From Swiss-Prot:
Protein known as: DNA topoisomerase 4 subunit A
Family indicated by similarity: Belongs to the type II topoisomerase GyrA/ParC subunit family.
Species in which this protein is naturally found: Borreliella burgdorferi (strain ATCC 35210 / DSM 4680 / CIP 102532 / B31) (Borrelia burgdorferi)
Any one GO BP annotation for this protein: DNA topological change
One Gene Ontology term of the molecular function aspect: ATP binding
Gene that this polypeptide is encoded by: parC
EC number(s) recorded for this UniProt protein: 5.6.2.2
Localization (cell): Cell membrane
Superkingdom field: Bacteria
Recorded GO CC terms: cytoplasm; DNA topoisomerase type II (double strand cut, ATP-hydrolyzing) complex; plasma membrane
Marked site positions, Interaction with DNA: 32, 64, 66
Amino acid sequence: MDIRTVLKDNFLQYSSYVIKDRAIASVVDGFKPVQRRIIHSLFEMHDGNFHKVANVVGNTMKYHPHGDTSIYEALVNIANKDLFIEKQGNFGNLFTGDPASASRYIECRLTPLAFDVLYSKEITIYESSYDGRNNEPLLYPAKIPVILIQGSEGIAVGMAAKILPHNFNEILNAVKSELLGESYDIYPDFPTGGIVDVNEYADGNGKVLVRAKIETIDEKTIVIRELPFGETTESLISSIEKAIRKNYIKVSSINDFTAENVAIELSLPRGVYASEVIEKLYHYTNCQISISVNLLLLSERYPVVYTIKDLIKFHAAHLQKILKMELELQKSKILEKIFYKTLEQIFIEKKIYKLLETISKEENILSIILSEVLRHKESFSREVLKEDVENLLKIPIRKISLFDIDKNSKDIKILNKELKSINSNISSIRGYSINFIDLLLAKYSKEHQRKTKISLIKSKNVKEIATKNMKVYLNLAEGFAGTSLFDGEFIGNASYYDKILVFRENSYVLKNIEDKTFIDKKNVCALVYDINNSKEQIFSIIYFNRLDNFYYVKRFKIDKFITDKVYEFLGENDEFVDFSLNPEFVEFSTNKDIVKRIEIDNFMVKSRSSIGKRISSNNLKKVKFK
């Protein structure tokens, strides 16, 4: 066989396996296979007591062929969702990122919610485990959108899923609204709290902006109280320290007082205040992160991208389907009870059992009793079978002699009342489903209050908050400028985003600020171009035109530029005379030595390539800015 064919076939098998059996969760119950197997093991082992996690992992290995480590990590992950597994012992710290204790030291058991919304053994479809020795659930008949509440993340071949967790109460209320035909909006809710901007959430397939919750104790002390989703105190502090090393922010000390709640205290040095540091924390550290989401799930073993509303609609219909199946199952059980109680009563009340005294041949017993019972077939809800007669013949004489017909009739009446209620629920399954959600909310809503605040985050441009932490020097004679040129003249403080603006006699150029940059020796001046404020700066030039022998004033702004590109502002027949940033007057003297002044505002601001305004129609001796 050709090696390319072998590789292609094996790759397809591998990629299909990873997608279907490892990385992507199901739309029905929200579980990946390993998670489903853990829950199944806990249902199997359930006796009301806590179980060693090591034992749960060992039992799960009967179903999961990938070793104990992956099972242990998945169990800890599910347990920390605080939904279906109750914990006892150290399961790690969500805030600090500290790991859980070894599996032999920690215990767990299922929560009541798991039994309320997952466990329904009689309607669960089972399949053989990987070795054929055991049966495991194909899917759980989940009554709530588990995937939206827990969230999920997985990377498969050529695709990835990133589903954020949502609030339990809000998801259930959304399903209820869907059943009622009402509108609703669903947004993420993170166990770490924080602040989330959902403007670009795009119904579960866009992105969110998440911020830490930061408080100001005083103008010199900042405390981080809540973390962005996916961050720990360790990773957050590491990002702050990195920003400090790069001189983006100034912090004198960082103290982590996190225990049950997050508390990272930042102390600020002299001359630095909380109001200016907080915005920089959001821009330069992991105090603010963007999370892209992709609602990819398995539907009937195929990957499908959903929206939040798609999932709510699916689970509203799925809830009705599951509840109806359970009601139909209850109905069949009650009908069976009514049938057998009726059969038993007729057998005893009509004294059919006495026929046993008259039958001489054993092989005739079933047929004779059955024919006698069938004389009352209108009393039965289904056909009477030979197996039913065999059950009658097993009734002890003592029970027959003590049989209470009145009590049995009352029992049948109660069962018929239950049957009527079940039939009513089946016929109005939508209302029954809404009532089921209300019962869940009444039972569990207090445990699942929203932790993340939804807010519009107005981020400043990073250039606006950049710290001017570089001192720039100029040596005009040698033609150098930079931050390490200490023998030069200090020309200003600059941020990473500022530039050095170099003016020559007929052009200008903007350069990046470096340790030492050659800017040429034939320069008029060089200065720091503030990326935020210099766009409004007016530059004034006096030049002499050799063709008409007149002096001109040109004024312009530099609001757009390309770094290192030379921009000319004088033509080949123009001769540079003077340059100024903020002149008040243009002063000139005539051939008769008369000195005059014109206010600078008389000269309009135009573009750099436009012709300047002529100062005077007379021949002038000297012109300069004042």
